[in-house]
Amino acid sequence: MECALDAQSLISISLRKIHSSRTQRGGIKLHKNLLVSYVLRNARQLYLSERYAELYRRQQQQQQQQPPHHQHQHLAYAAPGMPASAADFGPLQLGGGGDAEAREPAARHQLHQLHQLHQLHLQQQLHQHQHPAPRGCAAAAAAGAPAGGAGALSELPGCAALQPPHGAPHRGQPLEPLQPGPAPLPLPLPPPAPAALCPRDPRAPAACSAPPGAAPPAAAASPPASPAPASSPGFYRGAYPTPSDFGLHCSSQTTVLDLDTHVVTTVENGYLHQDCCASAHCPCCGQGAPGPGLASAAGCKRKYYPGQEEEEDDEEDAGGLGAEPPGGAPFAPCKRARFEDFCPDSSPDASNISNLISIFGSGFSGLVSRQPDSSEQPPPLNGQLCAKQALASLGAWTRAIVAF
């Protein structure tokens, strides 16, 4: 979902377009539909993410109520190095539960798809945990070479291939001259030169800038970070930012519609977001810096109203009779001042908020006011899996669509 732009600035731009397109045919309806579709799409995605988290909690409760032998089957999917929290995220049970949604065919199919995605995720984790085995063998070989020599490598499960042949010289033995035949394994590399002696050559290897001992720990620490999304209970909810992320003072938001002017406005804590951003103490708007929507309000286009052509003709006739000053046209400053008076304001007055009517109800405000968890991760699932199940209990969204 494309959420690169700030939601508040996008809504302010849409409101300004709605206000400036009153003279166009179908302009108000076009921009209003675009704004409403954007708000409803964000609300729907947030609602679906909440449904994902609820389904995950129900599945965890069903797994806790099962006998212990079923839980041992779930733990068999986990890799030896995986944390216990990732192992608890077992395969989803498709039948036998007391939930009414699990007995429906659509819900059963959706849970089956979630089960397949979970198995793919576990296979990727197994592959990631089995891949860095040679690095661990190299570290074990470096530690066990002084004590046990080549015998220490044979005890490790995945290090049999790295054991040198019987005829290969060890580290303490002198090297023999080169002879034609099978070449032995290369000896361990000596410690690298210090950073001062390292030439600044782009063709130099990467090991010159960093010691070889620093690269394997950094690379070995990166694969265990992948099971983190499965360990958090609400990792289905992290993909879609909510309007509550834009600041603590903007937590309570209400989207309202003026039935007289057909203008949709976002009201926060009893005042407009534009008035809040105009102050220098606003924490979520860049310390009072004007956004992209406010920058466009600097230049106002010339608005024509009924009877304007006749007034301009009268003024031109009156200007032709008098003496023309050397600066230019005589009545140009007066016309410009009169046109600025009819330029619409970029933000409506705060006194008109009482005349605005809420269209989304308590359901929308209850969803957007929730604060997400700090440990959320983007979900690997598609948002269309539980669409039918989530849209079956929609109440506030249908009222919002009917209102338009």
Curated annotation (Swiss-Prot):
Transmembrane segments: none annotated. Residues 195-231 have a biased composition (Low complexity). Residues 308-318 have a biased composition (Acidic residues). Residues 177-194 have a biased composition (Pro residues). Residues 86-107, 160-231, 308-327 are annotated as: Disordered. It comes from the Eukaryota. Belongs to the IER family. This is Immediate early response gene 5-like protein. It comes from Homo sapiens (Human). The lineage of its organism: Eukaryota, Metazoa, Chordata, Craniata, Vertebrata. The gene is IER5L.
